[in-house]
C-alpha cells in the first residue's frame, strides 16, 4: 500500500479499524499520555484527538502502537514481511560482486530501482500553505504534549530533524526530542554520535561564527518517518529509502529560509538555526527507561519560521517504561535487523530485542556454533556491526535449538550451559546511552556478554551433558491413548 502523506495513512488505518477519532476534549497535559498508554498496552488503535483542550490543532497519538501498524507504515501487510526489507538493506549495505553475467543482470533491477527513487524536488507543497515568521512564530499555539508529572516542560517527540554537514552532499534525518523553552526556542537533544550532532560539529569546526540551519518536520508520511529510524546504509539517503518503501519518489521542497529540503507533504515544518555556543540545560523528562533522566546541556534551536498546512495535524507520542511506542518500533524493526546481521554473520539463526529491555539494551542471539570461542566473536560483532547496538548493554548468545523469543528457553540455556566466570564477557569504558543513569559516568559504561552455548573441547575439560529426548514411539502411543485417560 502506498501512502503519499500522513493523511493517506490515517484514512487507511480508519478503514481497517486501526484508528479511532476522539471527539471528547482531552488535554495534552498528562491526559493524552494516560489515554495513549492504556490503549497501547491493550494493543488498541491509533488515536486522533480532534478537540485537544485549549487548541484547535488535532493531535495524532499511538500511531505506531502495534507492530502491525509499523509494518503497514513501511508498506508491508505484516511484520514477517519486514524480513524482505532487511534483506534489501543487507544487500545494499554490502553488495556482493556478481558471480557471472546472468547474476549481474538479475541484480540490475535492484540498482535501477534504487536510482529511480532519488527524491523529487517540487515548487509548491502542502507544507507551505501557511508561512508564519518573526513575531508570528509561537510554539505555544501547538498542542505539544506534557507527558509526565515530573517533566519540566512540553516536549516535541516525533519531530523529523533535517540537517546537512558542510562537507556532505546528502542530508541527514533523525528523530531527537526537543524541550520547548520559549515561543520560538527549543533544546535539541541529540547524542554526540547521532547524525545531526555530527553534522553540527563539522559546521562549527568550519564556520565557528555562523548560525547552523536546521529544519524539523512534524507529521511526515509514514515511510519517511520510519526511514529515519531504520538502519539505512550510509550510501543511501533516508529520503530514497522512504521512496523504496512507498513505491514512489519522496517529494521534497526547499525550505523558505535555507537550502535544506523538507518533506513536501509534512503537516508542519519548523525552520531556524542553532547559534554556535548557545546551549541550555535539558530535562528532566520521563523516558523509555521508566525513569526521569538527569539534566544535561544541549544546543538551542531558534525557530525563525513555521510553515504548515492550513489545518495541520500534530503528530506526537510519549516515552516511558515499556511497552511504549519506541519499544513497539523495536519489536517490528527487529525483523529488519535479522537479515542485516545474517549477511555479516551467516551463522546467526535469530536475533531478538526483548521489548522489556527498553528497545535495545538487551539482545538475544541464537547461532549455529562452529568452533570454540565462536559465541564471543558473535557477541562482539553485534556490538560493533551496527550503530543501533552501540548502547546494547547485554548480549546473550546461545545455540539454535533455543527459541530466542521464549524466556523459558533462554533462561534454561543460561542456567545449564554457562559457567558464570568462564562464560561471561565484561567490557569496560564503552559508549552507553546518556539516559542510562546506572552507568558510573554519563555516556560511558560497561557491557556484558553471556555465552550460553554448548561448550566445545578447548572450552571445557568435562564431558558435556546430553539433552534428554523423549521416545517417539511412546509419545505416539500416549497421543493415541490421551482421549481415553480423561485428564483434560
Swiss-Prot record:
Pathway: Cofactor biosynthesis; ubiquinone biosynthesis. Mn(2+) binds at residues 172, 238. Pfam families: UbiD, UbiD_C, UbiD_N. Its EC number is 4.1.1.98. One of its GO terms (molecular function) is 3-octaprenyl-4-hydroxybenzoate carboxy-lyase activity. It is a peripheral membrane protein. Keywords: Cell membrane, Decarboxylase, Flavoprotein, FMN, Lyase, Manganese, Membrane, Metal-binding, Ubiquinone biosynthesis. It catalyses: a 4-hydroxy-3-(all-trans-polyprenyl)benzoate + H(+) = a 2-(all-trans-polyprenyl)phenol + CO2. Binds 1 prenylated FMN per subunit. Prenylated FMN binds at residues 175-177, 189-191, 194-195. Homohexamer. This is 3-octaprenyl-4-hydroxybenzoate carboxy-lyase. It comes from Ectopseudomonas mendocina (strain ymp). The gene is ubiD.
Amino acid at each position: 500500500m502506498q501512502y503519499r502523506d500522513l493523511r493517506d495513512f490515517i484514512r487507511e488505518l480508519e478503514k481497517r479499524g486501526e484508528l479511532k477519532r476522539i471527539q471528547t476534549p482531552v488535554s495534552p497535559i498528562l491526559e493524552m499520555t494516560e489515554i495513549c498508554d492504556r490503549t497501547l498496552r491493550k494493543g488498541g488503535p491509533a488515536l486522533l484527538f480532534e478537540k485537544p483542550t485549549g487548541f484547535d490543532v488535532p493531535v495524532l497519538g499511538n500511531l505506531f502502537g502495534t507492530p502491525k501498524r509499523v509494518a503497514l507504515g513501511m508498506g508491508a501487510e505484516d511484520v514477517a514481511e519486514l524480513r524482505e526489507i532487511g534483506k534489501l538493506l543487507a544487500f545494499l549495505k554490502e553488495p556482493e560482486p556478481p558471480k557471472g553475467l546472468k547474476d549481474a543482470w538479475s541484480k540490475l533491477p535492484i540498482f535501477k530501482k534504487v536510482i529511480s527513487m532519488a527524491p523529487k524536488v517540487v515548487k509548491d507543497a502542502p507544507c507551505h500553505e501557511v508561512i508564519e515568521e518573526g513575531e508570528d512564530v509561537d510554539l505555544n499555539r501547538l498542542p505539544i504534549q506534557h507527558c509526565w508529572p515530573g517533566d519540566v516542560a512540553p516536549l516535541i517527540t516525533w519531530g523529523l530533524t533535517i540537517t546537512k554537514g558542510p562537507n556532505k552532499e546528502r542530508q541527514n534525518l533523525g528523530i531527537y526530542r526537543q524541550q520547548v523553552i520559549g515561543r520560538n526556542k527549543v533544546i535539541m537533544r541529540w547524542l554526540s554520535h547521532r547524525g545531526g550532532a555530527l553534522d553540527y560539529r563539522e559546521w562549527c569546526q568550519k564556520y565557528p561564527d555562523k548560525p547552523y540551519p536546521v529544519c524539523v518536520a512534524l507529521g511526515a508520511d509514514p515511510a519517511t518517518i520510519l526511514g529515519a529510524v531504520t538502519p539505512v546504509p550510509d550510501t543511501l539517503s533516508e529520503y530514497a529509502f522512504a521512496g523504496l518503501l512507498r513505491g514512489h519518489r519522496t517529494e521534497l521542497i526547499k525550505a523558505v529560509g535555507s537550502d535544506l529540503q523538507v518533506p513536501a507533504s509534512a503537516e508542519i515544518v519548523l525552520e531556524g538555526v542553532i547559534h554556535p555556543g548557545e546551549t541550555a540545560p535539558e530535562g528532566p523528562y520521563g523516558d523509555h527507561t521508566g525513569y526521569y533522566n538527569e539534566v544535561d546541556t544541549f544546543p538551542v534551536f531558534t525557530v525563525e519560521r513555521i510553515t504548515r498546512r492550513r489545518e495541520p495535524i500534530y503528530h506526537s507520542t510519549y516515552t516511558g517504561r515499556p511497552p511504549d511506542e519506541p519499544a513497539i518500533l523495536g519489536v517490528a524493526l527487529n525483523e529488519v535487523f535479522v537479515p542485516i546481521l545474517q549477511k555479516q554473520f551467516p551463522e546467526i539463526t535469530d536475533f531478538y530485542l526483548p521489548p522489556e529491555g527498553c528497545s535495545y539494551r538487551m539482545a538475544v542471539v541464537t547461532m549455529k556454533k562452529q568452533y570454540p570461542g565462536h559465541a564471543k566473536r558473535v557477541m562482539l560483532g553485534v556490538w560493533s556491526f551496527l550503530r543501533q547496538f552501540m548502547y546494547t548493554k547485554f548480549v546473550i548468545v546461545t545455540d539454535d535449538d533455543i527459541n530466542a523469543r521464549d524466556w523459558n528457553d533462554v533462561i534454561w540455556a543460561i542456567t545449564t550451559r554457562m559457567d558464570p566466570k568462564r562464560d561471561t564477557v565484561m567490557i569496560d569504558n564503552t559508549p552507553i546511552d546518556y539516559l542510562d543513569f546506572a552507568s558510573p559516568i554519563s555516556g560511558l559504561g560497561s557491557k556484558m556478554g553471556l555465552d550460553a552455548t554448548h561448550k566445545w573441547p578447548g572450552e571445557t575439560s568435562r564431558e558435556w551433558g546430553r539433552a534428554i529426548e523423549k521416545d517417539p514411539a511412546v509419545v505416539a502411543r500416549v497421543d493415541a491413548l490421551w482421549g481415553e485417560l480423561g485428564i483434560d
